Amino acid sequence: MKFALTGGGTGGHLSIAKALAIELEKQGIEAIYLGSTYGQDKEWFENSPLFSERYFFNTQGVVNKSFFKKIGSLFLQAKAAFKAKEILKKHQITHTISVGGFSAGPASFASLLNKIPLYIHEQNAIKGSLNRYLSPKAKAVFSSYAFKDKGHHVLTSYPVQNAFFDFARTRTEIKHILFLGGSQGAKAINEFALLNAPKLTKQGIKITHICGPNSYEQVRFFYQELGLLDKIELFAFHNNITEVMHRADLCVSRAGASSVWELCANGLPTIFIPYPFASNNHQYYNVLEFEKENLCYVAPQNELLPKKLFEVIRKLNQKDDQGNKNLTAISNQLQQKIAKDGAKTIIETILSA
C-alpha cells in the first residue's frame, strides 16, 4: 500500500496535505507528493521527511486568465499529467488524495487514467473548478461543509493539527487582540489594525499583529510614526501560530477555510473579513454557517470601519440571561463545533473502503 498526496498552491490546501501526511506516517504508510513549482508547494514540501519522494511540475492555474493564457496553462497541465501517470505507475501507488488547488490537476487526472482510486478533500464551502469536475469521478469527497452536487460526499471534521486543540482555552475577558494578516499579508487587516491601535493600547489591550513579509517594513514604519512600536507585537510571520492564538482573546482574520477551523478548534472568537476577490466569494461562504449560529462576526471589506471593532467588543462583553458573557459562550461553542483527529478519520475511512 502506497499513497500519493497532491495539490496545494496556498497554505490552506498545503496544511491539509501536511495533516494527512502526518497521519499516514503515524500509521506506517509510505507516501509521495506531487505538486507545482508555482505557488508554495516547494516551500512546504521540497525537503519534507513526510514523503519518500517529491515531484514538482511546471504548472499554473487556469481560472481568471485570458483565453490564450488558459490554453497555455491547460497544455502545461496535460503535459504534467502524462509525467504524473508514469510516476504513479513507477511507485505502484494504490491510493491518491487530492487536497485541491491547481497543482492537484496532473496527479488527479493521472490517477483516473491509471485506475487508481482518487479521494478528494474540499476545504471550502464552495468547490473550486477542478474539484467540481473531479467530484463525480472520485471514490469519495471529504469536506466539513455539506454538498448536494454529484459525487460521494463524506462529512468529516476538518483536518486541523492537534496543536490547535491542545492550545485551546475558553475566553473570559478581552485583554489581547490578534490581527492575522496571513502568509500573503492582507492590506485591509493591516490598515484596520493601525487605525484601531491607538485606542486599543490606550485602553490597555495588548496587540499582536502578523502582517505578512511583504508588508512588514511599511507596517512597522506606521507603528513607529504612531509611537506604538514598543507597545505592540509585530511579526512578518510566526512559526508558532498555536501559541500566538492561545494568548489572544479576540482575532481579526481573513476567512480561508484552514484559518476558520483552526480558530474554531482554538476557541478563539473572531471578526472575519472575507477576501472579496476569492473565487466564487468562497471565503464569505466559509463562515456563513458560523455567522448564522452567532459564532463569529463578519465584516465585508468594503464596509470596514474602525468603529466595527469596538462594536464587536461591546457585544462580546454583554451578558446573557444566566450572566455569562457572549465572549465566553462563543468560545465554548466554537470548541464543541469541531472534533479532534479529522485527518485520522479521513485516512481510516479510506483504508476501510
UniProtKB/Swiss-Prot annotation:
SS bond partners: none
CDD domains, per the entry: GT28_MurG
Chief place of localization: membrane
Protein name in UniProt: UDP-N-acetylglucosamine--N-acetylmuramyl-(pentapeptide) pyrophosphoryl-undecaprenol N-acetylglucosamine transferase
InterPro entries reported in the protein's UniProt record: GlcNAc_MurG, Glyco_trans_28_C, GlycoTrans_28_N
Organism ancestry: Bacteria, Pseudomonadati, Campylobacterota, Epsilonproteobacteria, Campylobacterales
Binding-site residues, UDP-N-acetyl-alpha-D-glucosamine: T10, G11, G12, N124, S183, Q283
Record membrane topology: Peripheral membrane protein
Keyword terms of this UniProt record: Cell cycle, Cell division, Cell inner membrane, Cell membrane, Cell shape, Cell wall biogenesis/degradation, Glycosyltransferase, Membrane, Peptidoglycan synthesis, Transferase
Domain of life of the native organism: Bacteria
First-level EC class: transferase
Enzyme Commission designation: 2.4.1.227
Cellular component GO terms held in the UniProt record: plasma membrane
Pathway(s): Cell wall biogenesis; peptidoglycan biosynthesis
Record's subcellular location: Cell inner membrane
GO biological process: carbohydrate metabolic process; cell division; cell wall organization; lipid glycosylation; peptidoglycan biosynthetic process; regulation of cell shape
Gene3D superfamilies: Glycogen Phosphorylase B
Role, per record: Cell wall formation. Catalyzes the transfer of a GlcNAc subunit on undecaprenyl-pyrophosphoryl-MurNAc-pentapeptide (lipid intermediate I) to form undecaprenyl-pyrophosphoryl-MurNAc-(pentapeptide)GlcNAc (lipid intermediate II).
Pfam family, one: Glyco_tran_28_C
Protein family: Belongs to the glycosyltransferase 28 family. MurG subfamily.
GO molecular function: UDP-N-acetyl-D-glucosamine:N-acetylmuramoyl-L-alanyl-D-glutamyl-meso-2,6-diaminopimelyl-D-alanyl-D-alanine-diphosphoundecaprenol 4-beta-N-acetylglucosaminlytransferase activity; undecaprenyldiphospho-muramoylpentapeptide beta-N-acetylglucosaminyltransferase activity
Keyword Lyase in record: no
Catalytic reaction equation(s): di-trans,octa-cis-undecaprenyl diphospho-N-acetyl-alpha-D-muramoyl-L-alanyl-D-glutamyl-meso-2,6-diaminopimeloyl-D-alanyl-D-alanine + UDP-N-acetyl-alpha-D-glucosamine = di-trans,octa-cis-undecaprenyl diphospho-[N-acetyl-alpha-D-glucosaminyl-(1->4)]-N-acetyl-alpha-D-muramoyl-L-alanyl-D-glutamyl-meso-2,6-diaminopimeloyl-D-alanyl-D-alanine + UDP + H(+)
